[in-house]
C-alpha cells in the first residue's frame, strides 16, 4: 500500500455543489480540511502545502481551485492508445477532468505516466490494462451533454437537464405536507425528514440523533475533547481556525482592512459584513414581508415578529414571550428588582429604556450629547447614527444638490426626491412610494398586521414609532416640557397643541 497523501483525505467541490451547501456546512468543510492537513503535518506525512489549503486559509471559495488544478494539467496518455482515447481533438478539453476522475477511480495510474512500450510483451500487458480501463472511458466519452453556465459534462441528457434546473427558478419537486418547493429531489427527501421526525444520523457516544449528517458531525466536534488551548486565558477550542481567530483578541491583530474607510477587523467575516454598509447590500430577505437585512442574525430575530410562537413562559403569572430577554425583564415586575438607577436623583427603574426616558427630565429633553460637535439627541440610537457623519467618509454625492452619503443605497433613495420616482406600488390601492420600507409599512393598513407588541400590556401596533410613543403611558414620564410655563406632557403632539395657548 502506498504512502498516505493529503489528496487521499481531501474532498473537492464544483461550484454548483459548493452553492448547495449552507454557511454552516461550508465552514464545517473548511475546518475539517484544515484539521486533516495539520494532522498530516504533525505526523510528518505532508511535505508541501497544497493549493487547496492555501485557498482555505485565505477563506476563499475552494471550487475555483478545482477547475484550474484539474484542467490545467492534462494526463500524459500512452502513445499506443492516444488515438483511441481522443477520437476528436475538439472534445479533449471537455473530458480532461472526467478522464482524470475515471483514472483515479479505476486505480490505473500507470496509464497516466507511461508514454511508450519497450517491446511487444510490455505492450500486450499495457493494452490489457487499457482494455479493463476502457470500460470506464466508454462512459466518459458519452458525457457530451454540457451545461452552458458552468463547464460540466454528463453521462445522459436527462442528467444534464436535471442539473440545468439548478440555474433556473424552476422547482418541480413539491412537499405534500407544507407545499415547499425544491429544484433537486434529494433536497426534498432531506426536507421530508422534518415532517416524519426521522433522524438517521446518530452519535454513538451520546446517542443523540440528527436528520442531517453535517449536524451530527458538528455535534461530535462540540462534545469531543478540545485540543487547541489558549496559553493566555486557558480557553480551549475544537477547531484550529477558531483558536487562531481567538488569539487575535490578546494580540490585538486586525489583518482585514476595509478599502473604503480604512477600518480594520480581526475576522474576514466581520469585514464582509462591514462592507455592506458602503454597498448597501442586504442579502438576507424575509419571505413574509420582503424586508431585507445585511446580517443573517438580524433576519433570524426579525422572523419572530411573524411567528406567533412564544416559547418563553413566566412561571409566576403564565405570561409568554417571544424572546428570553423580554422574559428576564418581565420577571423584575414580580421580584421588584430595579437595577437601573438615576445618578441625578437616585430614582431606580426595572428597565434601561425607562431610565433613559427619565433622564430627559433632568437634561431638558436631549441627554445624549456628542462631544465632537456639541449636538444633542433624545435617544442613544440617534446619537449612534449621527456619529457616522463624523467617522465615515461620504463617498456618494448627489449631483443635483451636493448632499453626500456614506451609502450608495441612501444616495439612490435620495435621488428620488429630485426625480419624483416612486417605484414601489401597492397592489391593493395603487398608491406608490419611493422606498420599499414605506410600502411594507403601508401594506399593514390592508392586512391588519401589527408586528410591534407592547411587553407591558400586549397592545400591538403596525409601526415601531407608535409603539415607542405608547410605552410612555406605562412609564408615567412626561418628557415634553413647555419652555414658557414649565408644564410637561407625555406626548409631543400634546405639547404642540398646548403651545397654541401662549401664541
Swiss-Prot record:
A zinc finger (C2H2-type) spans 145-167, 173-195, 228-250, 256-278, 284-306, 312-334, 340-362, 368-390, 396-418, 424-446, 452-474, 480-502. Keywords: DNA-binding, Metal-binding, Nucleus, Repeat, Transcription, Transcription regulation, Zinc, Zinc-finger. GO terms for molecular function: DNA-binding transcription factor activity, RNA polymerase II-specific; RNA polymerase II cis-regulatory region sequence-specific DNA binding; zinc ion binding. GO terms for biological process: regulation of DNA-templated transcription. InterPro entries: KRAB, KRAB_dom_sf, Znf_C2H2-type, Znf_C2H2_sf, Znf_C2H2_type. GO terms for cellular component: nucleus. It is found in: Nucleus. It comes from the Eukaryota. The keyword Disulfide bond does not apply. May be involved in transcriptional regulation. Belongs to the krueppel C2H2-type zinc-finger protein family. This is Putative zinc finger protein 730. It comes from Homo sapiens (Human). The gene is ZNF730.
Amino acid at each position: 500500500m502506498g504512502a498516505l497523501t493529503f489528496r487521499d483525505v481531501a474532498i473537492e467541490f464544483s461550484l454548483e455543489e459548493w452553492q448547495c451547501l449552507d454557511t454552516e456546512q461550508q465552514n464545517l468543510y473548511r475546518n475539517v480540511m484544515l484539521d486533516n492537513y495539520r494532522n498530516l503535518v504533525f505526523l510528518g506525512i505532508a511535505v508541501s502545502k497544497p493549493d487547496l489549503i492555501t485557498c482555505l486559509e485565505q477563506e476563499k471559495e475552494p471550487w475555483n481551485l478545482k477547475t484550474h488544478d484539474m484542467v490545467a494539467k492534462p494526463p500524459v496518455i500512452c502513445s499506443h492508445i492516444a488515438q483511441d482515447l481522443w477520437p476528436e481533438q475538439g472534445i479533449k478539453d471537455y473530458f480532461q477532468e472526467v478522464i482524470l476522475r475515471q483514472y483515479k477511480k479505476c486505480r490505473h495510474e500507470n496509464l497516466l505516466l507511461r508514454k511508450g512500450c519497450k517491446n511487444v510483451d510490455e505492450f500486450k500487458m499495457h493494452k490489457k490494462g487499457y482494455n479493463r480501463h476502457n470500460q470506464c472511458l466508454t462512459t466518459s466519452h458519452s458525457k457530451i451533454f454540457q451545461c452552458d453556465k458552468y463547464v460540466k459534462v454528463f453521462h445522459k441528457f436527462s442528467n444534464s437537464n436535471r442539473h440545468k434546473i439548478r440555474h433556473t427558478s424552476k422547482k418541480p419537486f413539491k412537499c405534500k405536507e407544507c407545499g415547499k418547493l425544491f429544484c433537486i429531489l434529494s433536497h426534498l427527501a432531506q426536507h421530508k425528514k422534518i415532517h416524519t421526525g426521522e433522524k438517521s444520523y446518530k452519535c454513538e457516544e451520546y446517542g443523540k440523533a440528527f436528520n442531517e449528517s453535517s449536524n451530527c458531525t458538528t455535534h461530535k466536534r462540540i462534545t469531543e475533547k478540545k485540543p487547541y488551548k489558549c496559553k493566555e486565558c486557558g480557553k480551549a477550542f475544537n477547531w484550529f481556525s477558531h483558536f487562531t481567530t481567538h488569539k487575535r483578541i490578546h494580540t490585538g491583530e486586525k489583518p482585514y482592512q476595509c478599502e473604503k474607510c480604512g477600518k480594520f477587523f480581526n475576522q474576514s467575516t466581520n469585514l464582509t459584513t462591514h462592507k455592506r454598509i458602503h454597498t448597501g447590500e442586504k442579502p438576507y430577505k424575509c419571505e413574509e414581508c420582503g424586508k431585507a437585512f445585511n446580517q443573517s442574525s438580524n433576519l433570524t430575530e426579525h422572523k419572530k415578529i411573524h411567528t406567533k410562537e412564544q416559547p418563553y413562559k413566566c412561571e409566576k403569572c403564565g405570561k409568554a414571550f417571544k424572546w428570553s430577554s423580554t422574559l428576564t425583564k418581565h420577571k423584575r415586575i414580580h421580584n421588584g428588582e430595579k437595577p437601573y438607577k438615576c445618578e441625578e436623583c437616585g430614582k431606580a427603574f426595572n428597565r434601561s429604556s425607562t431610565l433613559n426616558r427619565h433622564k430627559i427630565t433632568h437634561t431638558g429633553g436631549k441627554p445624549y450629547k456628542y462631544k465632537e460637535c456639541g449636538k444633542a439627541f433624545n435617544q442613544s440610537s440617534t446619537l449612534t447614527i449621527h456619529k457616522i457623519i463624523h467617522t465615515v467618509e461620504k463617498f456618494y454625492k448627489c449631483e443635483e444638490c451636493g448632499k453626500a452619503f456614506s451609502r450608495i443605497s441612501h444616495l439612490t433613495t435620495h435621488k428620488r426626491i429630485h426625480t419624483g420616482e416612486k417605484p414601489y406600488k401597492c397592489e391593493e390601492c395603487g398608491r406608490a412610494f419611493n422606498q420599499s420600507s414605506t410600502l411594507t409599512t403601508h401594506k399593514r393598513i390592508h392586512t391588519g398586521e401589527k408586528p410591534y407588541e407592547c411587553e407591558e400590556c400586549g397592545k400591538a401596533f403596525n409601526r415601531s414609532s407608535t409603539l415607542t410613543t405608547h410605552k410612555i403611558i406605562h412609564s408615567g414620564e412626561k418628557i415634553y416640557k413647555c419652555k414658557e410655563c414649565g408644564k410637561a406632557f407625555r406626548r409631543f403632539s400634546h405639547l404642540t397643541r398646548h403651545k397654541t395657548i401662549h401664541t
